[in-house]
């Protein structure tokens, strides 16, 4: 009986690994990602952060890449995306900016932005 359980566990793990890899590849080519450009020294960013965190709680499946423009690598990526102000939220698919939202916007505006993207 133990051998059967071990075999099922091994097959189950392999199946999960294969499905996870297949699902990740499919998701990464079709899904958008959210990129949040900010700076801790930006007053607007500090005001906006609680609003962003509140709205993101409604979208637990959404992962957000955070770019702090005080870090050189993050600044380069933010500039590549076209950031002109902080805070800015980009929707990026396959490296291409699909949409962006700039500034310390109201919670209703941010929620509407996320609803359009989901």
Swiss-Prot record:
It holds the Pfam family Thioredoxin. Its main location: secreted. The gene is bdb. It comes from the Bacteria. One of its GO terms (cellular component) is extracellular region. Residues 28-114 form the Thioredoxin domain. It comes from Brevibacillus choshinensis. Stimulates the oxidation and reduction of disulfide bonds in vitro. Keywords: Disulfide bond, Oxidoreductase, Redox-active center, Secreted, Signal. CDD domains: TRX_family. It is found in: Secreted. Residues 1-27 form the signal peptide. InterPro entries: Thioredoxin-like_sf (IPR036249), Thioredoxin_domain (IPR013766). Belongs to the thioredoxin family. Disulfide bonds join 42-45. The keyword Disulfide bond applies. This is Disulfide bond formation protein. GO terms for molecular function: oxidoreductase activity.
